[in-house]
Amino acid sequence: MQLSGYPMRQASCDMKEGGLRNKVAVIGSGSWGTAIANLLCKAGNETILWGRDENVIDEINNARVNSKYLPGVELFLRATCDLDYAVADASHVYIALPSFALSKVLPKLSLDKFSIVISLIKCLEPDTGRRMSEVISEALDLGHNRLAVISGPNLALEVANDEPSVSVVASANIATANIVAGTLKCPGFYCIPSSDIKGVEICAASKNLVALISGIARGMDLGDNTRAALITLGFRELLRLVLENGGTEETVFGVAGLGDVVATCNSHLSRNNKAGVLLAKGAPLDEVKQTAEGVVAISGVLALAERSGVYMPIAQALSQVISGKRTAHSLLDICFSLA
């Protein structure tokens, strides 16, 4: 589909002046990792995608698709199961792994001393509440100028299908954010550099809870009025958590905060939204956990809230629903008692 004002991207890696701009590695061959790797390739970077599943990697290399995680999308990149090969000489390394996989993969990364590492992970570390950039920084011994995160309304299938999208690239060093944004420069994909890495990461994790609540309301066949009220109440807790931890209102009410909440709560592509529907319908917890990482990562949000003295009764009640200690109906009662 051709959108007026948004030219479709080239069906191959664009050659810029002086050749390909950067050697880029993406670690993680799930839907978002594959989508961002394909985008980076289209933006003119020499891109290689790493994954553990040999069947997925072989399919990407031979059939140019990832039918398991991103069906129906033609891919223009190379993929490998060799981690050392993937990151060799890479100037930028994107991390698109589930949070539970970091402890297994990060120690194996052998990076160039000037490599910039970019987190695509939208959660906080379970039980500790540490931001993913903090976890990565400690594991790889990286300074702030070599760390960045990307967040926003980033539904992988829409990005992969060239739907116009806006994301925030955040780093404590704004120069780093600008450098990373440059590697992603591509028609239809727009990046806003930011130095509010704390706010962006906390928004990314907390919005999962809002989406779960929205999904629960949807799964209970409640109307849009109810769902809108629940989203607003959940968003209010997100706002308090971000501001108390040094984030800014500009981030919360921008695409990394409000924008991500709108997309995640309203799209049928949102896994956290789907997980909320499953919770409302009484699906087994294992099935819900497999649907979205946000279900597991709620403990990280609550840990950060406790550490920073932020009262989040809706998040606490949601955690009890997930653990089976509370019904979805009682969650609604708590939400509306706070209105």
Curated annotation (Swiss-Prot):
Q: Which UniProt keywords apply?
A: Cytoplasm, Lipid biosynthesis, Lipid metabolism, NAD, NADP, Nucleotide-binding, Oxidoreductase, Phospholipid biosynthesis, Phospholipid metabolism
Main localization of the protein? cytoplasm
According to its UniProt record, where is this protein located?
A: Cytoplasm
GO molecular function annotations of the record: glycerol-3-phosphate dehydrogenase [NAD(P)+] activity; NAD binding
The superkingdom listed in its UniProt entry is Bacteria
**Which EC main class describes this enzyme?**
oxidoreductase
- Give residues annotated as binding NADPH: 31-32, 52, 122, 156, 271, 293
Locate the residues binding sn-glycerol 3-phosphate: 122, 152, 207, 260, 270-272
UniProt key word Ribosomal protein: no
* Family note: Belongs to the NAD-dependent glycerol-3-phosphate dehydrogenase family.
Q: What does this chain do?
A: Catalyzes the reduction of the glycolytic intermediate dihydroxyacetone phosphate (DHAP) to sn-glycerol 3-phosphate (G3P), the key precursor for phospholipid synthesis.
NCBIfam families the record matches: PRK00094.1-2 (NF000940), PRK00094.1-4 (NF000942)
Q: What is this protein called?
A: Glycerol-3-phosphate dehydrogenase [NAD(P)+]
Species whose genome carries this gene: Tropheryma whipplei (strain Twist)
